[in-house]
Amino acid sequence: MRVRLCIACGVLALVHTGKAEAQGKLAGKMTCGKPDQNHVAPVGDSPDHVLTLSAVKCTWSQGDIGGDKVKDEIDTFTSDASGGVSRDRGYGVGTLASGDKYFIEFKGKTTLKGRTPVSADCKWKFTGGTGKAKGISGKGTCKGTFNPDETSSWDIEGEYKTAP
């Protein structure tokens, strides 16, 4: 009797429930405006060492999650800049065409010329979301270039899984 019960449990575990975990690759392009908020505090140990707190609004021109186009993203981050390099860490809240949201955490490095950003790279990971993006997980990379007017362009790559 126990053997039949265990076999029945195994068969039930294999039955399709109608909700499947979706996997995919994210490859997109994003353009960010000049930071809306940018608070700078000199550290005082050297003339070029500063800490900043910034927020920037970004628009995606390419990219989707499970067929839902990525529209925009607001990133809030801190930077520790000194010696031509900035170490950055922050969070992003993005909106899909459906209105669902995703949340990310990122950290990276920005190359500076003086105090002006030139290029950057980062690693990011999903930390959650709403609607279809609820329970999303995954990670990836980003590479950015900065323009003289403080706008920036980003190439985003990664992989994700959505919850069943």
Regions found by a protein language model. Name each.
Residues 21-164:
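Beta-strand-enriched cores of mature, soluble protein domains
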Residues 1-7:
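Bacterial N-terminal signal peptides that target proteins for export
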Residues 15-19:
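N-terminal signal peptide c-region/cleavage motif recognized by signal peptidases
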